[in-house]
Amino acid sequence: MSKTPLSIVHPWHGPVLTRDDYESLCCYIEITPSDSVKFELDKETGLLKVDRPQKFSNFCPCLYGLLPKTYCGDLSGEYSGQQSNRDNIKGDGDPLDICVLTEKNITQGNILLQARPIGGIRILDSGEADDKIIAVLEDDLVYGAMEDISDCPGSVLDMIQHYFLTYKATPESLIQAKPAKIEIIGLYGKKEAQKVIRLAHEDYCNLFM
């Protein structure tokens, strides 16, 4: 009896991003709020790898991962620059990041889930576009009814923004008030998030298809 070799779908290239014009999204989760290690997808192998231990006391306050078949390239960078009033902004060359809100205690990464985008955070990281889409887990009992970022509690948005402002900072840089590499330009709602996702999807198609 012959054995058929198993093939693993690459989380970045395999799953279908959306079937309904970016209303519902397939998301690949890399990090959970309980992780004391920063995991990230190895783009070459499709395996989840250890990027680095979390060195300081900040933990990601939500599920965090990427959107399959997205890439922050020329279109994403140009649009971010336009919306930020900055010149020569490029995409960061990675899949588009996503934060997923849920009241459930999901403690395992390296999973796929369906979520609905409600908005996003426009971020520049060392002068590169590095937006974070904010979404809610489909049918979540607490967050599932939210339609737009205006429905999300401000305290939740504050925690997410604080994490991204500080997760790369050292105590020394904070004490000495050194200029931050991470700059939050602002928040945006669902329609803008869908446009950011569409441009990142087009960047992916231009690069890989």
From Swiss-Prot:
Catalyzes the hydrolysis of inorganic pyrophosphate (PPi) forming two phosphate ions. Its cofactor is Mg(2+). It is found in: Cytoplasm. The gene is ppa. GO terms for molecular function: inorganic diphosphate phosphatase activity; magnesium ion binding. Its main location: cytoplasm. This is Inorganic pyrophosphatase. It comes from Chlamydia muridarum (strain MoPn / Nigg). It is an enzyme of class 3 (hydrolase). GO terms for cellular component: cytoplasm. The keyword Magnesium applies. It catalyses: diphosphate + H2O = 2 phosphate + H(+). Mg(2+) 1 binds at residues 92, 97, 130. Homohexamer. Its EC number is 3.6.1.1. The keyword Ion transport does not apply. Coiled coil: none annotated. Keywords: Cytoplasm, Hydrolase, Magnesium, Metal-binding. GO terms for biological process: phosphate-containing compound metabolic process. Substrate binds at residues 38, 52, 64, 167. InterPro entries: Pyrophosphatase, Pyrophosphatase_sf. Belongs to the PPase family. Mg(2+) 2 binds at residue 97.
